Amino acid sequence: MHLRGCACHLSLYCVYNDWENKIYRVPIFQCLFLEAETRSLKTFLIRGQSLDQESLNEIEVTRKETMLWDLQEQSNMMDKKIAAISSLIMNNGELLRKLSKFFVPLTVVLGDDGLEILEAYVCGEEPMLPLDTVPVILRCVGDYAALDTKHLLSNECTQASKKLRFGYSVMDFHFSLTVSDVKICFSHTDTGEAVCEKMKQIFYFSVCAFGGEQVLLVTPKNAYALLFDDDLCLLLLQSVFAFLHEKIFAVYKQVLVQLCEYIGPDLWPFGNERSVSFIGYPNLWLLSVSDLERRVPDTTYICREILSFCGLAPILGPRGRHAIPVIRELSVEMPGSETSLQRFRFNSQYVSSESLCFQTGPEDTHLFFSDSDMYVVTLPDCLRLLLKSTVPRAFLPCFDENATEIELLLKFMSRLQHRSYALFDAVIFMLDAFVSAFQRACTLMEMRWLLVRDLHVFYLTCDGKDSHVVMPLLQTAVENCWEKITEIKQRPAFQCMEISRCGFVFYARFFLSSGLSQSKEAHWTVTASKYLSACIRANKTGLCFASITVYFQDMMCVFIANRYNVSYWIEEFDPNDYCLEYHEGLLDCSRYTAVMSEDGQLVRQARGIALTDKINFSYYILVTLRVLRRWVESKFEDVEQAEFIRWENRMLYEHIHLLHLN
């Protein structure tokens, strides 16, 4: 029997022993398959090749066994475990390799039972996106067992890791699964029969014979992804699926029990990417979404997100990614190993070696001031065009031309470097060659190179030139360099912003710049950047305290107007970089949102709840004034500097209480 469609998800069902045929450690895989003709989802099984005992031991390492007091050893053990899991799924035969290329059109050959996939043939390059499906949305609340906070005082690992070491657990919980307009509520007190009846509203249950055993296939009716909010505690998430798994298989006692093993960032002592995977049950994608209460992503975005993984869920590591070939030869010579590209980092992204860029730790601070005009050149789709010309269509996420998807593009780029070395180097080399050519053109125009952000935003400074002359020259330089280096006919969209007579950059825990002064985003860094730009521009020849007072009061008015606006104040932080106050749940093991507290620690702040009373508004004002003070120190004499400090103290005394009024 032949069936046309595409694989939407692939996982392990279990590893079992075929006692009758004396075949041991046989992995059974399950594939969630979208049939093209009926547009319906089906679950098929694949019989894998027998494992050796060593590989099985690495896969079966328990959480308790990984909780070592040597943190680096714990991290290494988890790396070995996910490497073994990924290798099992990706390298257990050519058939599984084909099925792990999600949304690629396939024709599968089924066995006589219509249950087992025996072979698969690729029958197209254009991704077959299941756009008529809808995601399952998980929401959950619960209570936790009390934990002595003295166990959490040290900073050697994340708070989540320390909690798990000391037996942190969920006492009770309630959750709901929502598909379209169907919402099903569950409680930890539900019986197995009640759970199965509820689950059958959105999942098909079927018991089938396979390899001399009975297996239970749980197939979503019209979904291949489950979404949960970034701010959902990962311990609650684990509890939900452990509960569902236990209750379902307690009812279906006669079947071969499916695995249900959680892999998430809290299993690493220093945290990991915000990604989750269950080996076994459930057989669908679990995706973390920011601010899910207010914005449910559409199916197209979910497909792009999955394609950007380049294979399995990111938490399963580099071995869970495909080696993607390059679809065109470069006309310019690639550098050899001795002259390989030097890649520096700024804002956690790779940038050209020709740019001035920063390698910052959590407490590093970088400042730049200039009396020159600053130009910010943005090429929002340059990465998309480069990837489109080098990545095979079947592997390329269908990125929109909208610049808001730059974060997804950058994540896709970063994942290419682990297995798709030639492709990653080709894209980076073309980008580096283009940036180098653009830099030389800017130098000929007597413009100074400052930095590159996120591979597509270029900061430059220039003296005494009319912007009506400079901007067309910059656009011409971009277009000529692009056409010459990349040989891509479509030119990147060009955006250029001029900030006259004021150029500054401040980078520490956050980014302030005159380049943000024209942004319409509602965030304190934008307001602070506008204030600093106005002060620097108005006081180039002398320090006028009347003007900086007016600008300061304008800034305070905006701060006060956003007093209760959570998104205005929160920042994102990497796990284990800063000291974080105690909070309920496991919420700091991946990148998280927080605000600064009165005692200098971060306070975990979710997007969907009211702003914490512990926020220290003074911190944000002081940081802004600190940047302005550094500018005063670089520009004026000791007398003005002393007067500025007195003015600064007075402003704080007169205004800070306004932010704390209810």
From Swiss-Prot:
Coiled coil: none
GO biological process: DNA replication; viral genome replication
Disulfide bonds: none
Role, per record: Component of the helicase/primase complex. Unwinds the DNA at the replication forks and generates single-stranded DNA for both leading and lagging strand synthesis. The primase synthesizes short RNA primers on the lagging strand that the polymerase presumably elongates using dNTPs. The primase-associated factor has no known catalytic activity in the complex and may serve to facilitate the formation of the replisome by directly interacting with the origin-binding protein and the polymerase.
GO CC annotations, alphabetized: host cell nucleus
Presence of the UniProt keyword Zinc-finger in the record: no
Cellular location(s): Host nucleus
UniProt keywords, alphabetically: DNA replication, Host nucleus
Primary location class: host cell
Pfam families for this protein: Herpes_HEPA
Gene this chain is encoded by: U74
Family listed: Belongs to the herpesviridae HEPA family.
Subunit structure of this chain's protein: Associates with the primase and the helicase to form the helicase-primase complex. Interacts with the origin-binding protein. Interacts with the polymerase catalytic subunit.
Name the record gives this protein: DNA helicase/primase complex-associated protein
